[in-house]
From Swiss-Prot:
Belongs to the aspartate/glutamate racemases family. This is Glutamate racemase. Signal peptide: none annotated. NCBIfam families: glut_race. It comes from Nitratiruptor sp. (strain SB155-2).
């Protein structure tokens, strides 16, 4: 079974890591639209256009499923992608909320949702959380985290100052990492909150969804991974080596 994974940049590698670790597919084709990252500040029509263009790329590979590992795309373009596809298209927002619910948190818990302007502004997370009984919601756009990750700043004073800028005086019970770039700095986020907040990671949420809702089971063979980028593929390959720890066979074409 072959899966396509699409993101605006390198952040979707966090979803790829979870998919590889659980062995849900025989092959994963990853495309990062690094020439046009970030999608977060773009308007809805632009995000839809970029997403449909990326979807055309995957038609060259006869994928069985497409995972939009970008919250901005999941917030604004998921229906357009589904109507234009002959295969299932899975977003990251609903799996993230369901993963939170599966943690068994008290409905009165404060839920902090962080993401790009496009994701937070769409209100999709807030709406779904309320539908699942969570009303103590703080949704906060944290766009600076995206270029920080793209610049491979995973620790140090720049990241620490940005964490302070966004999170000063906040004390959430759980945090939904509403951008697939953010798990690359999840250790720093967890440390900032003294490891007291439950973190919901899109990659693990997608795995839960694929297993429970679609019945996809682990394969016995080691999955293969092909990496593609619209610009600077060597940077994508470098970050993949860091994040995936060279644990899997990767080919960058």
């Amino acid at each position: 079974m072959r899966a396509g994974v699409f993101d605006s940049g390198v952040g979707g590698l966090t979803v790829v890591k979870s998919l590889l670790e659980h062995g849900l597919f025989d092959e994963i084709i990853y495309f990062g639209d690094t020439a046009r990252v970030p999608y977060g500040p773009k308007d809805k029509n632009t995000i839809i256009r970029y997403s449909l263009e990326a979807q055309e790329f995957f038609k060259n590979f006869d994928v069985d499923i497409l995972i939009t590992a970008c919250n901005s795309v999941s917030a604004h373009a998921i229906e357009e992608l589904r109507s234009n596809a002959s295969f299932p298209v899975i977003g990251v927002i609903e799996p993230g909320v369901l993963a939170l619910q599966n943690r068994g948190l008290d409905p009165k818990s404060q839920i902090l949702v962080i993401g790009t302007q496009a994701t937070i502004g769409s209100g999709k997370y807030q709406k779904l959380l309320r539908e699942h009984g969570y009303n103590n919601i703080l949704a906060k756009a944290t766009p600076l985290f995206v270029p920080i990750v793209e610049e491979e700043i995973f620790e140090g004073p720049v990241l620490e100052a940005t964490l302070q800028h966004y999170f000063d005086s906040l004390h959430p019970d759980a945090i939904i990492l509403g951008c697939t770039h953010f798990p690359l700095i999840q250790d720093a986020i967890a440390d900032y909150f003294n490891n007291e907040a439950v973190l919901i990671h899109s990659g693990e949420a997608i795995v839960e969804h694929l297993q429970k809702e679609l019945g996809i089971k682990a394969r016995k063979k080691t999955p293969s991974l092909k990496l593609f980028a619209s610009e600077n593929p060597e940077k994508l390959k470098k970050i993949a080596a860091h994040w995936l720890r060279d644990a899997f066979k990767t080919n960058e074409l």
